[in-house]
Amino acid sequence: MLYPEVFGTLEKLRWNMAKDVPWDRFDLALLTDEQATTIKMNAITEWSALPATEMFLRDNRHDSDFSAFMSVWFYEEQKHALVLMEYLRRFRPDLAPTEEELHQVRFEFDPAPPLDTLMLHFCGEMRLTQWYRRAAQWQTEPVIKHIYGLLSGDEARHGGVYFRYMQQAIERQGDEARAAFAKVGVLMTSSARSNKPLHPTNLHVSAEFFPRDTIQSRLPDPDWLEHWLDKQIQFDSSWEAKVVNTILIKLSNLFGQPFEGIKDLNRYRKQFTQPAATAS
């Protein structure tokens, strides 16, 4: 059982919104309307941890250990939304998200295989770690730069916890877990081919609500994410390479063999599909 240790570790590292954010350093002259608007969009996106947690708890009723960790993940992710909203409330109240705008991103996701979802969110945390690092560099106002640094650190730690649950899944479920993690790993490292940001909030999750079944499609500006990444924080190929390399290194450690690139991971993935293909 991982939850007791994970809780203790994250508890020691948890930052305090009142004490660890230098609110008194705010400089209005260093915050543009463009930058403030992206903070609003990030805040609403972070609020989507609510439906994601509902999905995790529904699909992991068999795993009370992981479900208990969701209490920590949900708390910290909702705090991300809250600190961004507090920043806007203090300094740009005209851009603070409304309750209705927040509620728009709460809808029921279709059931999905828990192992696939675990890997999907591990990759999402690795990606968001780098997105927020780049956002901290792009922002010019010192308080929000500091906040994005805090968020990036949290996302990296969350990814580390997901990785530990992935290790546990391999110990317990063997090749079933390896196949799921390799399959989703190939998907989530293939952003160049997909031509869209590969993050859980940008993937279709509900047939009932299609095409408005991604988190991003329910934001006030559904196209903001691509613009934020490409034109604003300029998350270019060098930054994307950091994400892909991190995922490949972690999977190399997880599976006990080196992956120099996505093609290596894809070859590894195919070994789990061959028996089924032969049987058919």
Predicted regions and their residues:
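Non-heme di-metal
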Residues: 1-280
